[in-house]
Amino acid sequence: MGYRSDVGFACTPMVKQIIEQVCEWDSDLEELFQCAQDLAHCAKSGRWFWEYAKWYDSYPDIQIMENLMTILDRSELYDEYGMIRIGEEHEDIETKGSPHEFDMYVNRSIDI
């Protein structure tokens, strides 16, 4: 079964182009994005959501995504993307980049 997370990732057109190029080279990353919901409001920007995903650092596709975000951060391009991961445990929330720049935020609620 494994530990599951919900993950949102949004980016500028520049970062989307990089992702599309890397997907052409790497079938694991391409499959990761094919499994995501594409929520982009326009064709240029990137906006994806993975629900109930195994977001393990040991998986090759996740390693590529993590490396891409690290490169963007080290290049001071952290405002070119935003990522939020919410794990199963209440306090397991991870953010990278600048999610607020893409109107991304965490909202926990109970519907009865």
Predicted segment positions?
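Short, extreme N-terminal segment that most often corresponds to the first beta-strand
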Residues: M1-C23
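Charged interaction segments
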Residues: Q21-I112
